[in-house]
Amino acid sequence: MSQVIDSKHTPMMQQYLRLKAEAGPLLLFYRMGDFYEMFYEDAERAARLLNLTLTKRGNSNGTPIPMAGIPVHAMEQYLARLVALGESVAICEQIGDPAAAKGPVERRIVRIVTPGTLTDEALLPAKADRALAAVCVTGKREPRAGLAWLNLASGAFHVTECAPGQLESELHRIAPAELIQAESAELHMAFEGARTRVPDWHFEADGARAQLLAHFKTDSLGGFDVEDMPAAVCAAGALLRYAARTQSQALAHVQTIAAERPGQYVLLDPVTRRNLELTQTLSGEESPTLFSLLDGCRTPMGSRLLRRWLHHPLRENEPVLARQHAIATMLTARQEGEQAFAAAALLETLRDALNAFPDIERIAARVALRSVRPRELASLRDALVALPALHASLAPLSGSPRARELAAQLAMPPDIGELLARAVASEPAVAIRDGGVIAAGFDSELDELRALATDGGDFLVQLEARERERTGIGNLRVEFNRVHGFYIEVSKGQTDKVPEDYRRRQTLKNAERYITPELKTWEDRVLSAQDRSLAREKWLYEQLLDALAQYVRPLSQCASALAELDTLAALAEHARRHDWVAPELIDGAEIDIEAGRHPVVERAIERFTPNGCRLDQTRRMLLITGPNMGGKSTYMRQVALIALLARTGSFVPATRARVGRLDRIFTRIGAADDLAGGRSTFMMEMTEAAAILAASTPASLVLMDEIGRGTSTYDGLALAWAIAYRLLTHNRALTLFATHYFELTRLPAEQPTAANVHLAAAESAGGIVFLHEVREGPASRSYGIQVAQRAGVPAAVIRQASRELERLEAQGAPTPQLGLFAAALDADVQSQAMTEQAEDAAALAQLRDQLAAIDPDSLTPREALDALYRLKQHLT
């Protein structure tokens, strides 16, 4: 929109156009009384997106101005819908006094709401973070990508650097809701969130550095360990500038930067996160996933931390062991003098105590941003009262160093609890504009104004009695409503008795309403007291927020400790209920699992068959064969999930497990086209395989399922063999390689660090029975036809397939096919190949007929020997 601001517009519309120019492409919510109004293109866009009624207001150059509006009290629900659609909104409030304004009341944009800058409880998912990220790529010869991300609802601020080719994977790990980039930046990568472009100079090194130094009030960034990350510093400075602008204030709760270094986490690429169904199923559902299974957390903070742990398994053993030891202590600690079974009761006591705590992490952030609601302060006050009980329940956990550290972080200055207890009403109103937020007795002036505004009942009763006696009107009533204020109501039949000092205020069908000088004087005093009371209460609330600002840091530390205790307790409870064990963590690259179980699948079926897995220096690859539906994919995912859980500090579903230091987990499981990107199933498969071959190391865990199935038999077999061989001899990664190419089972004969295993199945009179048991050695059959029969394929098709299978097996080799890599054959060569194939088939058919004609029971030894020589002549 580009409306010219001139005298043809009303003063109010001139003000709107100036503010709209400031908001730019954002939707502008323009406060007018009890509504937020939108005009021109904003009104048309909002009406379309929110299904609002589009009306008109005034004219612009002879054309009616489109207008749409939403009630102030319903703003949050409309904001949530707009943000979900990827829209950003500038909120303009009235900051002047309408009564004192000579022209339009003063207004200004007080906040900008974008997908990555949400802080309101109603707009945020309780169990997931919504980060704001910025990316900056620097250098031409050796380019580096700097990435910064901020969780505005908690104040957590992180930076990292990586190669530009890893940027997409890093963004998938962080999953920001919004990405900031320079206007001129060309970033060719998949990203599902909102993208926001800002001027290039926001990313300039000197300006970005100055932005960070000013925010943290320091002369050097050395204390944040980011001096050697110039690209990340540029991204962080631009991000901080953008975030502060959206909030129209400094971000006091953003108090440090955490620098993430390569090697800190076990890397999971987007394909692996999807295939392992950590927080989302393959069909996009939130359950059943590993997160939904483990999320027994009692607080939203704990749930969010658990989600982060699952997406960020740790490489180093020390922090993992600290978590593991804390969980073990929760499972074994007892109060002094209690019986052996009391460990479970102690854990339940701890978890019950955690129920008392609201989302302190986000409340602390909203205190810093001065957007905290009165009821959130009341819940914070009640939570601080519950802290001593929680602290006492942690005493038996003193054997865990990590538990002791967390208990120490729970300590809060007593002043904050006392302040909230004195200042906040026991059950405050939803918003400060409604009054009733500040507790009685906190401020004497407020108490006096409230008394004046509310203690008028006796006066009204006395006035009504006097007026009835003075006028002789027995049904005269003194009442009040919000529109007309106080009034005296007289029925139509009694209006002739009304005195001269009665002034008509409203006419109804059956009554008249009046005001008297005495009632008017009293009304002015009461309403003035109400207005002054509300103004005083708003001022006191602002003073309370000023006083609470100093406690943001200890509140954030307390929230962090509560979240970790909650997460550890949830993992401990799950381990206790489902017989999970503490894995042994070692330095070398090794996975040794005894009787492991898939954590999600075992909860979904009645009986789950446990299976072990050993991968180490002498056994780096398992070639997995077996029937379709036999459980190969489940087994592979099971191993990966157990390894991942072990690296988060959790117990694992097994009777025993030993897991080494892994650097990455790769998966190539399942088949899917990328229609939008123009990539077929086979192309997707090869792209993922190429990434694994390029990046996996001897410390990586690789899962490859049915590689090569998207092309011809010979091509697929050749590729599968070559990829397996490369992984085994060059990458030397710990590999689970599932295949239907039985030719691959010869690989262990050439490479002793490979081994064959198979998923067992048994045939019975009723068909095939899947045992789901992993056994040593290759499978003997794939049972594809039996699986098709169980799937309901028509019997005629099954019979024909069985006959065709017998024919192909009799030939002893797959039907020749033209591979993708084969040179084109001329017509003569193709004809010759087909002729030779036909001759071979005829010879085999003749041999089969002769065999069928022999009756071994009727032959003498000499006749049997002669028959054998005749058959041999056919083969030579």
Swiss-Prot record:
Any one GO biological process = mismatch repair
User: Could you say which residues bind ATP here?
Assistant: 626-633
A molecular function annotated in GO for this UniProt entry is: damaged DNA binding
Superkingdom, natural source = Bacteria
Q: Which family does it belong to?
A: Belongs to the DNA mismatch repair MutS family.
- This chain's protein is named DNA mismatch repair protein MutS
Q: Name one GO cellular component term.
A: cytosol
Recite the lineage of the species: Bacteria, Pseudomonadati, Pseudomonadota, Betaproteobacteria, Burkholderiales
Give the matching InterPro entries.
DNA_mismatch_repair_MutS, DNA_mismatch_repair_MutS-lik_N, DNA_mismatch_repair_MutS/MSH, DNA_mismatch_repair_MutS_C, DNA_mismatch_repair_MutS_clamp, DNA_mismatch_repair_MutS_core, DNA_mismatch_repair_MutS_N, DNA_mismatch_repair_MutS_sf
Q: Does the keyword Membrane apply?
A: no
What are the protein's UniProt keywords? Answer: ATP-binding, DNA damage, DNA repair, DNA-binding, Nucleotide-binding
SUPFAM superfamilies according to UniProt: DNA repair protein MutS, domain I, DNA repair protein MutS, domain II, DNA repair protein MutS, domain III, P-loop containing nucleoside triphosphate hydrolases
The answer to whether the entry has keyword Nucleotide-binding is yes
**The protein's role, per its UniProt record:** This protein is involved in the repair of mismatches in DNA. It is possible that it carries out the mismatch recognition step. This protein has a weak ATPase activity.
Under the heading PROSITE patterns, the entry gives: DNA_MISMATCH_REPAIR_2 (PS00486)
